């Protein structure tokens, strides 16, 4: 019979403990490395029967924390699930995992819901990769740690098993120094280089963002990460915005994001024909790629809203109305979308239907 373990480090997460435990208590083993909690996290977990070990990671690195937690997992475990305390397994998860895991599987890929829209529907989501066999794996990277294997891997995909993330509201943590350290350690690792470029963008250090992403583009052929690099370069170098966005749309025809960004650019320029065309092109992409670069806006209200506005200015009023309705359906609490739809309906009733 398959034996499954939950593992991970934690610190000062007492407010999450009960819901986290309730979601994963059907595991055979739950091993947690407490890295210095002072809010009762350790005591709450021990009271629930969780195996908690005190550890200190000095200097702090995420890979050392997760590897230490993984080493606490017994050798007779078949499948390991890294589950942070702000994450939840969904009801019936064990049966779904056992059904999805094949004899040859070494890592399971599953829908990971990273955040949630205001109406409770999934926001950003992608195929997670933190469920793996017990042998041969370790975490690598001071931050944005990646799971690496010294053995050949076989990934199995499922849509039935999911992990949901419920992050605490907080400002961006300071990952920059750890990312710079990771790049110094692994200068030829394109994944870490891409994360560093993104962190420079978050902190609006645009010159370093552009330089880092350009280095990355010379290192990687990964279309997902290249798409994010190219669209971010459009922000870092506004004078080359169209070049970078069109390159992204050309290289990654599976993603809406570059096309929606182009439609938004032409909306701001009041170029309604191009805004209309790029919105249409974005909406022709109907298969969600399910990777971490996909934004809920591009796969929700935004292309419909842009198309509606462009159609209005091109006097295509029926299409304008249809797209305005769809945009509001996808973001029903948006006051501007409500006002736009009423304006369109009133105009059509007065001028075209009377």
Could you tell me what each predicted segment is?
Residues 15-18, 39-48, 92:
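Acidic helix N-cap motif at the loop->helix transition within catalytic regions
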């Amino acid at each position: 019979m398959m034996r499954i373990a939950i593992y991970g480090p934690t610190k000062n997460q007492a407010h999450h403990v009960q819901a986290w435990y309730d979601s994963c208590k059907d595991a055979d083993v739950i091993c947690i490395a407490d890295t210095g909690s002072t809010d009762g996290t350790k005591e709450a977990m021990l009271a629930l029967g969780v195996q908690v070990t005190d550890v200190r990671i000095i200097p702090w690195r995420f890979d050392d924390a997760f590897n230490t937690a993984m080493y606490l997992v017994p050798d007779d475990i078949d499948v390991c699930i890294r589950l942070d305390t702000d994450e939840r397994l969904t009801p019936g998860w064990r049966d779904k995992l056992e059904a999805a895991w094949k004899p040859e599987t070494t890592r399971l890929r599953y829908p990971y819901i990273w955040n949630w829209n205001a109406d409770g529907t999934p926001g950003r989501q992608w195929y997670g990769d933190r469920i793996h066999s017990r042998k041969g794996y370790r975490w690598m990277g001071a931050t944005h740690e990646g799971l690496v294997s010294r053995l050949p891997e076989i990934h199995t995909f499922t849509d039935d098993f999911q992990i949901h993330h419920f992050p605490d509201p907080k400002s961006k943590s300071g990952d920059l120094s750890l990312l710079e350290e990771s790049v110094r350690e692994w200068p030829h690792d394109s994944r870490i280089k891409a994360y560093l470029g993104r962190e420079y963008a978050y902190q609006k250090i645009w010159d370093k963002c552009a330089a880092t992403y350009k280095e990355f583009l010379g290192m990687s052929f990964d279309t997902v990460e290249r798409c994010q690099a190219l669209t971010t370069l459009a922000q870092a170098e506004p004078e080359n915005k169209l070049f970078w966005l069109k390159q992204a749309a050309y290289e990654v025809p599976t993603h809406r994001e570059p096309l929606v960004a182009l439609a938004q650019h032409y909306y701001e320029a009041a170029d309604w024909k191009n805004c209309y065309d790029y919105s249409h092109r974005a909406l022709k992409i109907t298969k969600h790629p399910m990777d971490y670069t996909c934004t809920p806006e591009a796969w929700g209200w935004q292309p419909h809203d842009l198309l509606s506005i462009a159609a209005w200015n091109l006097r295509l009023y029926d299409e304008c109305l249809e797209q305005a309705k769809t945009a509001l359906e996808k973001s029903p609490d948006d006051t501007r979308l409500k006002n736009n739809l009423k304006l369109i309906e009133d105009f059509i009733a007065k001028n075209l239907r009377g």
